[in-house]
Amino acid sequence: MANFTAADVKRLRELTGAGMLDCKNALAESDGDFDKAVEVLRIKGAKDVGKRAERATAEGLVVARDGALVELNSETDFVAKNAEFQALADAIVGAAAAGKIGEVDALLAAKVEDGRTVEQAIADLAAKIGEKLELRRVAYFGGTVEAYLHKRAADLPPAVGVLVEYESASGDATGADAAHAVALQIAALKAKYLTREDVPADVVENERRIAEETAKAEGKPEAALPKIVEGRVTGYYKDVVLLDQPSVSDNKKSVKALLDEAGVTVTRFARFEVGQA
């Protein structure tokens, strides 16, 4: 007897974009386990499954100030456009910057300018407008920082925010320009890690396993599997590791190569996107 329902199939389809029958078969093969079903779909070649599965269902905005980046969520984009909601986000990121706060719990306990805690200010506005509001995440970097905010639509507040902490050998505009280019790169290509060494070992191993099983499913010869797997893992690194990515400004060079030319070292970065995990 199947350990899933028609509603589960529909949910997996909405999550991954794969076909209805493919989703049904993947759930059957994974005994109803959603994470395993996503892997099954990846192995069998469903396009963009991994990327689509990261999506969440939230509205809201991101805001940055003085080394702090905050994501504040609402239930609808109507509220995200509300002036009071945007003012609240500005007050919250101000509290994060002033207190050098990079953790949600600490920021909820911090105070905004009128003396209320961030948690109380959020609760008060939620009660007033009748929607659930949530402080989703916060980052704070204390070094030299470049911030970039991107709007999905002209009538909506920024939905993508990037912070890049960096060191520049020259300390002039060249370094700032390079950091800005990197922030744009992160916003567009969604790097998850700074270096290959930052990718967790279990994540790499899982990518190797999926690459091998995919190659086998495609009928590739056994002797060719190691080379194919290494090639696909290298491709994975180019997708998710910032320094390995081809630069959007010059795709013949990696981000690392362009940063080296500019004498810039990125020490860490954060990328928030409303509606994504």
Curated annotation (Swiss-Prot):
Gene3D superfamilies per record: 1.10.286.20, DNA helicase RuvA subunit, C-terminal domain, Elongation factor Ts, dimerisation domain
InterPro entries: EF-Ts_dimer_sf, Transl_elong_EFTs/EF1B, Transl_elong_EFTs/EF1B_dimer, Transl_elong_Ts_CS, UBA-like_sf
One GO cellular component term: cytoplasm
This protein's UniProt keywords: Cytoplasm, Elongation factor, Protein biosynthesis
GO molecular function, one term: translation elongation factor activity
PROSITE patterns given in the database record: EF_TS_1, EF_TS_2
Location in or out of the cell: Cytoplasm
Claim: Ubl conjugation is one of the keywords in the record: no
Natural source organism: Mycobacteroides abscessus (strain ATCC 19977 / DSM 44196 / CCUG 20993 / CIP 104536 / JCM 13569 / NCTC 13031 / TMC 1543 / L948) (Mycobacterium abscessus)
Record family assignment: Belongs to the EF-Ts family.
Location of region: Involved in Mg(2+) ion dislocation from EF-Tu: 76-79
Protein name according to UniProt: Elongation factor Ts
Function: Associates with the EF-Tu.GDP complex and induces the exchange of GDP to GTP. It remains bound to the aminoacyl-tRNA.EF-Tu.GTP complex up to the GTP hydrolysis stage on the ribosome.
